[in-house]
Amino acid sequence: MGVKRILACVECRSRNYSTKTNQQSHTDRLEMKKFCRTCNRHTLHRETK
């Protein structure tokens, strides 16, 4: 079953993206480089609690 995970920008803390992942295969926190509209550039986005 997919779990909804919200990604927040590391620099400005803006919550820009939401994804669904498999809970069993992704036990650690998700990190991706994505475009942040607030910063207007590509930054690291981490999963929030």
Curated annotation (Swiss-Prot):
One of its GO terms (biological process) is translation. GO terms for cellular component: cytoplasm; ribonucleoprotein complex; ribosome. InterPro entries: Ribosomal_bL33, Ribosomal_bL33_sf, Ribosomal_zn-bd. Pfam families: Ribosomal_L33. Keywords: Ribonucleoprotein, Ribosomal protein. One of its GO terms (molecular function) is structural constituent of ribosome. Signal peptide: none annotated. The keyword 4Fe-4S does not apply. PANTHER family: 50S RIBOSOMAL PROTEIN L33, CHLOROPLASTIC, LARGE RIBOSOMAL SUBUNIT PROTEIN BL33B. Belongs to the bacterial ribosomal protein bL33 family. HAMAP family: Ribosomal_bL33 (MF_00294). This is Large ribosomal subunit protein bL33.
